[in-house]
Amino acid sequence: RHKGKLVTARTIKMGRAWTDEALEAYEIKLDEDERPAVTGFCVVDWEFRGNNVQYLTQYLVEDIVAETHTSLITTVSPKNIFGLDNILTCNFRIVGIKEVYGGYLRFILKKDFRPSLLPIWTHGHLQIPIRDKSAQMKAIAEGYAGYKLVRKHKSGFHILYAKTAAA
């Protein structure tokens, strides 16, 4: 709140039934010992946009969730460049692309709080245009995860994909 005005709102699902429902919709398979939380929407008042509020609230959520959960799952629209950049900056990895919420295309992203599963091997990474859904899905199927958004002068935005340590 700022001067009695709500600046931002963010949702998070931590209960097992809620997270299982989201994971089923996203078609995400996790290890048996994982206990994920799932973040939903984050809205920021127009007056406060551009001040990293989404980024800061994401870290606040992580402080709460990391105590009792092994990972955090979220989705971002491929059309939301700033939101995608914020989430990737928070060390999330793109692990899927799926139509959810009534047919809207979303990147499915995961952040693992277990240190042994965080590394990616950036040597030999792939650079895929953000609009090339099939190339991204192929990379994910081959064990790559999206980790960075880059802007190319002539060809627009691309996502860097690297092999995950477990792959």
PLM region descriptions:
Residues 5-43:
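Conserved acyl-donor/pantetheine-binding loop and adjacent beta-alpha core of acyl/acetyltransferases
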Residues 15-17, 47, 79:
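Short coil/turn motifs at secondary-structure junctions
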Residues 65-78, 104:
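Conserved GNAT acetyl-CoA-binding A-motif
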